[in-house]
Regions:
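Conserved short loop/turn motifs at secondary-structure junctions
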Residues: 1, 101-104, 181-183, 254-263, ...
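Intrinsically disordered, low-complexity regulatory segments
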Residues: 1-162, 166, 454, 465
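Basic, low-complexity terminal or inter-domain segments flanking catalytic cores
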Residues: 2-3, 90, 173, 206, ...
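C-terminal or mid-to-C-terminal helical accessory/interaction module adjacent to the motor/catalytic core
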Residues: 93, 135-217, 254-258
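Metal- or metallocofactor-binding catalytic centers and their adjacent structured scaffolds
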Residues: 149, 232-265, 271, 542
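Phosphate-rich ligand and nucleic-acid binding surfaces
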Residues: 221-223, 253-254, 324
Length: 689
């Protein structure tokens, strides 16, 4: 029999249905010479540092750097049962070969290989590589299974990525956490992404706006401008000189321009536009397209390609027709698609651009959640736009000369709306006000025309600071590691991959280093402080992008994994050596985040409010006051923060309403600290005489 292992149960069910494996078992399905099971994502992961040595359970500076000589892997605790199922199936004598059917990408390969190796399996396996979960795509994929060894380099790159993240994350996080006494999470990709947020925030906070003035002259529907005049006095002088005077059309240029249709969506571009149009976070969009993929309504979403292959032309035409019939927004739209414009075999590696599938024909779109309908509309719109006609317009540039000053204006007239007609239809459905196009059509004039008695006016303006990143603009920056110099034909060296960028943004928010304000992503105080204390080799987007590029080269067989990891280890060791100690002032950069209520009577260190206690901040000191200690509990009292503060401040506190089983009434007493330095703090009572 053949054992097929998918990444998750829903995908396994789709595959099992096609293969005829319809008999349900505990953790798998069986039938038609196939056993189909699944992984629940990562079942096996790199072991924690404490698995290598018990002393690593405590975070100590002196243990750094931690670099395993031989890597260990462990089964994820809450997924142990499914690993047992897979391990048993791999050892089943009926099974002669396997099919890796996890997601067709770097992480999917890693998920399968780690389970395969951890289970000690040596049976041959083939690779299912598909871009859709439609029945026809699954059948086609099983008819063209590939030798699993063809993907050894992909696995090597995935494992190298995982090890590099472990080395940088474990050592960087422990190093700066022990130095600053606050958990500071450092990540190979997460930290440089945070650095971009901090850099932008710094530019905004230090920005000094400058005032400038524009002078406008015109008559009737024609107005031209002289921009960026430095002083109000000069602007007013120019306006006064031109008021009621004659202006001449000194130059008139007309040019026909075209705007090519946009490319199809890859994941990052889709996430950006879903954020711009709908306000979806990158993670929300990823979750939605993954759901639609599993519903067989979209092709594989974690792609970095914006093209399809030439053998998909007929399918693309069919899907365009289905989109116009099935998505109400585009009903009645009729286009003659130019499929050649979105076809380029050389720009499709693992997966083609994201498209709706022919399965959409059978779907009642109105029955889908609104969020899924929005994503389908967005992808449908892009498909129609990308294969539509060019947008053509005539641009007119006019210069007016008046009293020795040149005033300029631009206008345009649409010649052929082309693909923009579909985009406008989509934008109109959003019911949000679009910004007015600054270039409107101009009245007809000719060079040399005179305008008598023009009016002149002055407007005041200010230079504007850079804008905070949104998920749209941050994803764009991550694609190029903050380098804006890439053109469309340059291979980008970015931060992370399309599949991981959403998770990176979420980690920054969950760790408290960034926060969402409306659509903006803003670094927190801790986020800014973290970037300030970290060295450039950790915060540099360019360096991290080079690492990501090396991983791609490992995948292609052009770089050595051992050399890559050696460089990561060397950098980590240098990092630890560069931070042997901190001054007391620097160590308090992040503060404690804890409430101090007094000084320890044993060592003089601050005493903080804890969970159910008040404890000495000195780890070598055991002084602690418990809210529900036996002394106070026996008197039906709780040691409150107010009582603790007085005990630390004066050594005693007057407490009222104390209980004793010997008498029916409550009593008052002075309670004093009677601390002998032992494990528990003692108290004694004094009564008024």
């Amino acid at each position: 029999m053949i054992l097929v292992i998918a990444e998750k149960p829903s995908v396994a069910q789709s595959i099992a249905k096609v293969l005829g494996a319809t008999s349900r078992k505990d953790g798998y399905m069986e039938g038609g010479n196939y056993i189909v099971s699944w992984c629940f994502g990562h079942l096996v992961e790199l072991a924690d540092a404490s698995s290598y040595d018990e002393r690593y359970a405590k975070w100590r500076y002196d243990d750094l750097p931690i670099v395993p000589e031989s890597w260990m892997f462990e089964v994820t605790k809450d997924k142990a049962q499914q690993f047992k199922v897979l391990s048993a199936l791999m050892k089943d004598k009926r099974v002669t070969e396997l099919v890796c059917a996890t997601d067709a990408g770097r992480e999917g390969e890693l998920i399968f290989r780690l389970v395969y190796d951890k289970a000690g399996c040596t049976k041959p396996f083939k690779r299912l590589w598909i871009s859709s979960l439609e029945d026809s795509a699954i059948r086609e994929g099983f008819n063209h299974l590939r030798d699993g060894k063809e993907y050894d380099r992909l696995y090597e790159a995935a494992l190298s990525r995982s090890k590099a993240d472990w080395i940088v994350g474990i050592n960087g996080t422990r190093l700066f956490t022990t130095l600053y006494h606050k958990k500071l999470v450092v990540g190979r990709v997460q930290t440089p992404t945070l650095a971009m947020l901090v850099e932008r925030d710094g530019k905004i906070s230090t920005f000094q706006k400058e005032k400038y003035f524009n002078v406008h002259v015109g008559k009737g529907d024609l107005t031209a401008d002289l921009e960026k005049v430095k002083t109000k006095e000069e602007a007013k002088r120019i306006a006064a000189a031109c008021e009621k005077k004659q202006a001449v059309v000194s130059s008139l240029k007309q040019e026909t321009k075209t705007v090519n249709p946009p490319k199809l969506y890859d994941l990052t571009t889709l996430q950006r536009e879903a954020n711009r149009y709908y306000g979806f976070t990158a993670q929300q969009t990823l979750d939605l397209v993954q759901t639609l993929y599993e519903k067989k309504l979209l092709t594989y979403p974690r792609t970095d390609s914006q093209f399809i292959t030439d053998d998909m032309e007929d399918t693309a035409r069919q899907v365009i027709s289905i989109v116009c019939r099935q998505l109400p927004l585009f009903s009645g739209v009729s286009i003659t698609p130019d499929i050649a414009r979105v076809t380029d075999n050389s720009k499709v590696t693992d997966h083609h651009a994201i498209l709706p599938t022919v399965q959409l024909e059978k779907q009642d779109v109105s029955a889908l959640p609104q969020s899924e309908q929005k994503i389908l509309n967005l992808i449908g719109m892009r498909l129609l736009c990308a294969t539509g006609e060019k947008h053509t317009y005539a641009e007119t540039q006019i210069s007016l000369s008046c009293e020795g000053y040149e005033f300029k204006t631009k206008g345009k007239t649409v010649v052929q709306n082309g693909w923009k007609a579909i985009e406008e239809l989509f934008k109109a459905s959003l019911k949000t006000k679009e910004k007015d196009d600054p270039m409107k059509s101009l009245p007809e004039v000719h060079e040399g025309n005179m305008l008598d008695g023009v009016s002149a006016s002055v407007t005041e303006h200010f230079t504007t600071p850079p804008k905070q990143y949104t998920e749209d603009t941050l994803l764009s920056a991550m694609e190029t590691a903050g380098n804006d110099q890439f053109d469309d034909d340059t291979e980008k060296k970015g931060l992370g991959t399309p599949a991981t960028r959403a998770g990176i943004i979420e980690k920054l928010v969950k760790s408290g280093f960034a926060e969402r304000k409306g659509k903006s992503l803003i670094p927190t105080k801790d986020g800014c402080n973290l970037v300030c204390v970290l060295p450039e080799q950790i915060t540099s987007p360019a360096m991290t992008a080079e690492w990501e590029n090396t991983l791609m080269e490992i995948e292609r067989g052009n770089a050595d994994a051992d050399a890559f990891l050696s460089g990561i280890v060397r950098m980590t060791g240098d990092l630890v050596k560069a931070y042997p100690f901190l001054s007391d002032a620097e160590a308090q950069r992040f503060g404690t985040g804890k409430e101090e209520i007094g000084k320890c009577p044993r060592c003089g260190s601050p005493v903080y409010v804890g969970k159910g206690n008040f404890y000495c901040s000195n780890k070598e000191c055991s002084f602690c006051l418990w809210e529900d200690n036996k002394f106070f509990s026996s008197k039906k009292k709780k040691l409150t923060k107010k009582i603790a503060k007085e005990l630390l401040d004066k050594g005693w506190c007057r407490v009222t309403g104390l209980y004793t089983p010997k008498k029916p009434q409550l009593y008052d007493a002075v309670i004093r600290l009677d601390d002998s330095g032992g494990k528990y703090v003692s108290f004694k009572m004094e009564f008024d005489r």
